[in-house]
Amino acid sequence: MTSLRPLETSLSIGGRPRRGLVLPPPGVGAGVLLRRGAMALPGRRGFACRGRSAASAAERTKEKKRRDSSKQPLVHLQVCLEHQVKFGEHVGIIGSTKELGSWEEQVELEWTTNGWVCQLKLPGETLVEFKFVIFLVGGKDKIWEDGNNRVVELPKDGKFDIVCHWNRTEEPLELLGTPKFELVGEAEKNTGEDASASVTFAPEKVQDISVVENGDPAPEAESSKFGGQWQGSKTVFMRSNEHLNKEADRMWDTTGLDGIALKLVEGDKASRNWWRKLEVVRGILSESFDDQSRLGALVYSAIYLKWIYTGQISCFEDGGHHRPNKHAEISRQIFRELEMMYYGKTTSAKDVLVIRKIHPFLPSFKSEFTASVPLTRIRDIAHRNDIPHDLKQEIKHTIQNKLHRNAGPEDLIATEVMLARITKTPGEYSETFVEQFTIFYSELKDFFNAGSLFEQLESIKESLNESGLEVLSSFVETKRSLDQVDHAEDLDKNDTIQILMTTLQSLSSLRSVLMKGLESGLRNDAPDNAIAMRQKWRLCEISLEDYSFVLLSRFINTLEALGGSASLAKDVARNTTLWDTTLDALVIGINQVSFSGWKTDECIAIGNEILSWKQKGLSESEGCEDGKYIWSLRLKATLDRARRLTEEYSEALLSIFPEKVMVIGKALGIPDNSVRTYTEAEIRAGIVFQVSKLCTVLQKAIREVLGSTGWDVLVPGVAHGTLMRVERILPGSLPSSVKEPVVLIVDKADGDEEVKAAGDNIVGVILLQELPHLSHLGVRARQENVVFVTCEYDDTVTDVYLLEGKYIRLEASSINVNLSIVSEKNDNAVSTEPNSTGNPFQQKLQNEFSLPSDIEMPLQMSKQKSKSGVNGSFAALELSEASVESAGAKAAACRTLSVLASLSNKVYSDQGVPAAFRVPSGAVIPFGSMEDALKKSGSLESFTSLLEKIETAKVENGEVDSLALELQAIISHLSPPEETIIFLKRIFPQDVRLIVRSSANVEDLAGMSAAGLYDSIPNVSLMDPCAFGAAVGKVWASLYTRRAILSRRAAGVYQRDATMAVLVQEILQPDLSFVLHTVCPADHDPKVVQAEVAPGLGETLASGTRGTPWRLSCNKFDGKVATLAFSNFSEEMVVHNSGPANGEVIRLTVDYSKKPLSVDTTFRKQFGQRLAAIGQYLEQKFGSAQDVEGCLVGKDIFIVQSRPQP
């Protein structure tokens, strides 16, 4: 799956180092990346530490250990490994001290644009041995570095950093006395945790908010937000106008470019300085776009601006003279365009996601920066008489002149370096000079919008009302309490958890205030000062999102220190306090995602559910199950939904960025490393990443509580075959050279797949997403005797990946799934419950329904009373006239259901539960109608010719696809005659909404259900004959989709034998829809019916919609109902009579905290018992196990379809 789950798994098992001895996997490459600008700055002092032999190192280590470790001072060490790994792989450090896992467990490093980074607190005057490893989260295996252990001798105390390269274990380790890399993300917050890892906080790093005694923020000279991200050229101070044409080496490659990408690259080539590059972006964003082009323009702009701000695209002087007010004016125009898009009616969640990534890279346009001569303080500083002449010249030529002629991000970097230089030795320079330069630095950060969170919040204080100021003050106060925790020793982890929670809550409150102020959008007539303040508000709320990333990461680290998932699972029975706190943290994290515009309704629903389940606690029991079981099962559904939200976010980024990053990166000459790691850095830099990590901890704990193995079995059985991985089950997804049996690992499914159509040699499927058991895909797999299981748990999936390419045995039962490598290939590749019916066309269709005489008699009477169509023709039939011969098995079954429904009011189960149900009114457009329409349109000859060709057409060369499209094009334009519409109007009320459904002669048969193979079109009306006719044409045309053609070919059915009738029924507006199997599909227990239930229309169940339904197991004979799963589909499909009858449905976000089936045990039990009674009744009347579809409308159960259960 394209998600936060690891994608690459070709890891071998490495050995454990024992004093320099390692067992690396053979052939492990060591692709080393060289980061630009990685050299230490001038004047940096450090000392080199040579690699030593592990034997001598061990002796010195023993001597060190004899000292009293409790009195040893600490060394703060930041480690950076410059190495590229595959997406999904992680890097860890493991070593000889307890802080490094004592060679047992690695400490995870976190990805940044500068490499893999972690911050450690280690005892001073200690000899440390260590190595780096590569691993997958949840996996047990590691790839170790080659060579001897690395050895470093730490000084007594201090703060240092070291830079390492994979497999270069003999390289000298230089301890630099000041951090080479600015701490990013949680690294700057985790100094209080032993061996805690930093987390990417890539473009938006957050500085601490200092506070003074009265609780107000206190300004200080903090470094800029993107200084530590700088990957441009090293600052060179000039004492004269020595600007050279440094851009001469740049290369632009416009090969293959067109549209927006070409315009951007050509614009960059013609624009040397920053304001001209900003103008290129403004020109692109101000154009009129359709929805897709707008997203492309935003993505290219976001990538381009980020590379400018990080120095990977350099800015130079071009001989012109434009003060920073030029940049500010352009920025205001860009900001206005972005804000108009942000709240546009057609703006998508993806658009908003990218817009938010552009904002931090725009300069400020406050009035002081749009003035004719802005940022004049540096001019006064450059002409001071109390500083040396050479220093004055360097400031004048490197900063002042450059800034006032062609300002760019490099000016802020130069100013940072100069400030560090003049403050390095107190008293070396005039105090007033240092003070003025520090103030100028703050002004420059303000211009570049690169200030810390505190500085940004300070800038909006004047615009907050009284209540807003109170919320801000509360946040600052809680932040001060958290700062005190950072300096406290031996503080209880539970206390730390509570303080972090309080800070998260106050942060969320403050961000809520800002979002409410922004949600009204930008007025067209807004004055310039209001727009400038709006920019500050926007940047503040973005920075608060960034800081929530830091806090949530610290929360997770502290939770792990308390025992993580194991502690949570252990505490369920006796105390849910830690659960409550952790769930509150998750809700806050999801709220931050909502504030950022990503699937807001979904975030709100998930938050409501978590809070509701938390409030319910363990009080609710069901049957013999205690409250812990129902609580866990319900919470599992919502946690899976929350995890799905994060995966969809990462999938969105993967669909948005990689291709465009590659295109524009190549064209602009960006280093390959930056291109390859761009998207992963974006995924790991967002709050969604931390929400995903917290979900993982909670999911693991819930699995332990439930005793879940992570597998879900749709079709039990045993299969032997080579394990292969494909993205989807599609014809052509397997190489034609593969003839032996295969078991597929499948990333995604949409419910439209035919397993055997992708290959007759497919004997088993492992799907990496949740899927309803009784979905169309599940039914087809069962009918095709394909062992089918699903799994979404990362650790289990990781283990499965390791078997790829091996010949394996997949054994799936109702209680467990086993995967194992087998040495000898088994001739019996698959063993499931076989179908006894064989080829459906070897049977007589009229024997499909054998009904008792008490039902046959009412049917015969109904036939005698009705008349067929208009003037005796068969333009349409009443449902009571439908037969297998005239309208197919589905329509005939609906006719039978209408009779059974009239008798069901008198039927009760042994427990006295009524088996009563209703059916919707209906009619049928019979077999032959499509052919008649072809004759009238003059297309019958073309249709017949294409049908003959498709019998022998090949799949591999696309011939089937081409012919299928031609057939559909001919048929989809057909519509039933006017007399059919007139007849149907006599049956249905004038304003009723209808659904037109397929009823082919090749579906709903024992041995060939063809579930979901053909189309149904909901929400049409006879009031609009054209729309109704078009819907009928689509149903007819679905007889010749590629999938339908290949499905019939796989079943040995000639295409000319297939024909289609159309079942027209009143569409219902259900609260719940269900699929019911009257014999348990997992273990074939005839005493148990199993139902899967979804909110709204039943298409959610039939398709491959991601999510799980309510799953109920109901005993026919004793009335016991067991809940096997709670629903977590994100959306329900509904039809409103007040809306247009256009063949479309409305999708609404579901909040299960408001659904009776989730919150009411009694309702769930009664509903399950009614389904069991109805299922048993239908099974008895039809004489075999049934696959039943129906719904609940108010208090009435409707049955819309019943077919033989595969």
Curated annotation (Swiss-Prot):
Keywords: ATP-binding, Carbohydrate metabolism, Chloroplast, Kinase, Magnesium, Metal-binding, Nucleotide-binding, Plastid, Transferase, Transit peptide. It is found in: Plastid, Chloroplast. The keyword Oxidoreductase does not apply. It catalyses: [(1->4)-6-phospho-alpha-D-glucosyl](n) + n ATP + n H2O = [(1->4)-3,6-bisphospho-alpha-D-glucosyl](n) + n AMP + n phosphate + 2n H(+). It is an enzyme of class 2 (transferase). SMART domains: CBM_2. Residues 67-168 form the CBM20 domain. GO terms for molecular function: ATP binding; carbohydrate kinase activity; metal ion binding; phosphoglucan, water dikinase activity; starch binding. GO terms for biological process: starch metabolic process. It comes from the Eukaryota. The keyword Transcription does not apply. Signal peptide: none annotated. GO terms for cellular component: chloroplast. Its EC number is 2.7.9.5. The active site is at H776 (tele-phosphohistidine intermediate). Residues 1-56 form a transit peptide. Its cofactor is Mg(2+). Transmembrane segments: none annotated. Residues 1-20, 52-71 are annotated as: Disordered. The reaction takes place in three steps, mediated by a phosphocarrier histidine residue located on the surface of the central domain. The two first partial reactions are catalyzed at an active site located on the C-terminal domain, and the third partial reaction is catalyzed at an active site located on the N-terminal domain. For catalytic turnover, the central domain swivels from the concave surface of the C-terminal domain to that of the N-terminal domain. Belongs to the PEP-utilizing enzyme family. The N-terminal domain contains the alpha-glucan binding site, the central domain the pyrophosphate/phosphate carrier histidine, and the C-terminal domain the ATP binding site. Homodimer. May be required for starch degradation, suggesting that the phosphate content of starch regulates its degradability. This is Phosphoglucan, water dikinase, chloroplastic. It comes from Oryza sativa subsp. japonica (Rice).
